[in-house]
Amino acid sequence: MSHLVKEIHSTLLDDSYYRIDHPSGLTILVMPKAGYSSAYALFGTKYGSIDTRFKRSDEADFTEVPEGIAHFLEHKLFESEDLDAFARYAKTGASANAYTSFERTCYLFSCAGNFKASLEILLDFVQSPYFTEQTVQKEQGIIGDRKSVV
């Protein structure tokens, strides 16, 4: 499979970046910056706090989900059976975070080295969710506590 790569010049930034349309449907934007000592990557999904239903491509009907599920998933995706994503990033020297807005959930990291290893961590944990009944209940409690504070 080939990837469609397009160079785009931004007059606002007076700089160029590349858009890669991956066969999986993922859109990748790359902006190389010569002379910079750190790198940054963000994986964004079009699923945010206002999304309470979705439709899978292999199903006819919509699936309804509780409010707060995007924020819940934002937290859960960092977990794994062995070593959570934050611990994995610490081994590469990267710093990671995530946020949920109305329309998006985004996972990101910055690093001064080991970019490829850090990118592999990002792509791994967002595509390999780890759920157990115990960890789901724990996270539900944390999200519930945050809602009661607001």
What residue spans do the PLM features occupy?
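Conserved small/polar residues in nucleotide/adenosyl-binding loops
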Residues: V149-V150
